[in-house]
């Protein structure tokens, strides 16, 4: 083996391995202290790009879950208020039935009307004051809003909240009253007992109801017969013996038309819009009609509450799915970017041992040129 003074190859080799061990030790310490095995693009360019995309998706999913929870909160707030609206309407219905009883005097009905007016005011107050985050929910101003429940654009769900004020047309319907009242001796005559009602059902389109009353039926029995033939309208009789028919705006579109011999004899007047806001139970006829109006309003409220319940269930399932996606996305990101501490501590120990060994060898290699002095004597 040649003895050189100017070039110490052994020292250079030891130095190179010492630098390599030091770099490996520094890298392991960086990974262990940060918790990430990818801290710079040079660590893993492709892995960094993929993990960043997954991180963006994960953060988007977190926001989507918060958005969905906000949507559920809005629906719960609105549905809770509508529950009280339902209670008010049920009380109004009870009062309407009570007022329609013949044992009540005019003063009794006026007192009942006062309670109905107070209930109506509270119903409207609930509709006007129910809010979430400054947004009014039930007075008709919320309309339709979108809720972003996905990590990317275009993943939105629409929520509509209806107007729950008592003067909303959907909280009632149309009233048709016969111009000619019938006394207790009036009966349906043979050959003049037909009545046709043409109306447009929102679900099935235009329909014509053909009714043939029995000979000898009085006006009350005629109303009962009409109610027994179809659930698309409600018939009742007022104090003056006038037949009145109510159609629900939630089910019937537009106005109904009447034909047949009975229609000519009774002479129905033009349709009149009626809602919970116009309820008047100071008369028997008004009390009877009020029951039908409240039933229509209850149907409207219950239908919307069912929609909100379905909306909440849908969002709960959406949140479960988002959480599942987020879990898998983060698991994938972790496999790419996170430090494996067991593996990295092993690598650190290895690099520390190699560093110490390289330092020891380098120290010995630096002493090799001293052998030349021995040769010089």
From Swiss-Prot:
Keywords, alphabetical: Bacterial flagellum, Coiled coil, Secreted
Annotated localization: Secreted; Bacterial flagellum
MF (Gene Ontology): structural molecule activity
UniProt xrefs under Pfam families: Flagellin_C (PF00700), Flagellin_IN (PF07196), Flagellin_N (PF00669)
Example of a GO cellular component annotation carried by this entry: extracellular region
Stretches of the chain forming a coiled coil according to its record: 103-129, 301-340
Family: Belongs to the bacterial flagellin family.
Role noted for this protein: Flagellin is the subunit protein which polymerizes to form the filaments of bacterial flagella. FlaC is not essential for flagellar synthesis and motility.
Subunit structure: Heteromer of multiple flagellin subunits including FlaA, FlaB, FlaC, FlaD and possibly FlaE.
NCBIfam families documented for this protein: PRK08869.1-1 (NF006466), PRK08869.1-3 (NF006468)
Protein's recorded name: Flagellin C
Species of origin: Vibrio anguillarum
Organism ancestry: Bacteria, Pseudomonadati, Pseudomonadota, Gammaproteobacteria, Vibrionales
Gene: flaC
């Amino acid at each position: 083996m040649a003895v050189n003074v100017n070039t110490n190859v052994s020292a250079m080799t030891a130095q190179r391995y010492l630098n390599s061990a030091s770099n490996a030790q520094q890298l392991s310490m960086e990974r262990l202290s940060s918790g990430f095995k990818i801290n710079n693009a040079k660590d893993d360019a492709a892995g960094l790009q993929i993990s960043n995309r997954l991180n963006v998706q994960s953060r988007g999913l977190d926001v989507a879950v918060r958005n969905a929870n906000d949507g559920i909160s809005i629906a719960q707030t609105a549905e809770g208020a509508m529950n009280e609206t339902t209670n008010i309407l049920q009380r109004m219905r009870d009062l309407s039935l009570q007022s329609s009883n013949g044992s009540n005097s005019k003063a009794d009905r006026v007192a009942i009307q006062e309670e109905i007016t107070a209930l109506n005011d509270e119903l409207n107050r609930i509709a006007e004051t129910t809010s979430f985050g400054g947004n009014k929910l039930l007075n008709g101003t919320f309309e339709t809003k979108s809720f972003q429940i996905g990590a990317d654009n275009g993943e939105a769900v629409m929520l509509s909240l209806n107007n729950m004020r008592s003067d909303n047309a959907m909280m009632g319907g149309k009233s048709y009253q016969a111009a000619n009242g019938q006394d207790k001796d009036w009966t349906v005559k043979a050959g003049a007992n037909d009545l046709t009602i043409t109306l447009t059902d929102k679900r099935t389109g235009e329909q014509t109801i053909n009714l043939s009353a029995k000979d000898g039926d009085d006006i009350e029995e005629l109303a009962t017969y009409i109610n027994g033939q179809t659930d698309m309208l409600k018939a009742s009789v007022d104090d003056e013996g006038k037949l009145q028919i109510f159609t629900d705006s939630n089910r019937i579109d537009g106005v109904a038309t009447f034909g047949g011999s009975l229609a000519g004899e009774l002479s129905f007047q033009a349709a009149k819009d009626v809602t919970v806001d116009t309820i008047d139970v100071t008369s028997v006829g008004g009390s009877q009609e009020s029951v039908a109006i409240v039933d229509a309003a209850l149907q409207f409220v219950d239908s919307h509450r069912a929609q909100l319940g379905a909306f909440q269930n849908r969002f709960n399932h959406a949140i479960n799915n988002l959480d599942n996606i987020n879990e898998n996305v983060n698991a994938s990101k972790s496999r790419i970017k996170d430090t494996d501490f067991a593996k990295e501590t092993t690598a650190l120990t290895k690099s520390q041992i190699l560093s110490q060994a390289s330092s020891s060898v380098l120290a010995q290699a630096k002493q090799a040129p001293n052998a030349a002095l021995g040769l010089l004597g």
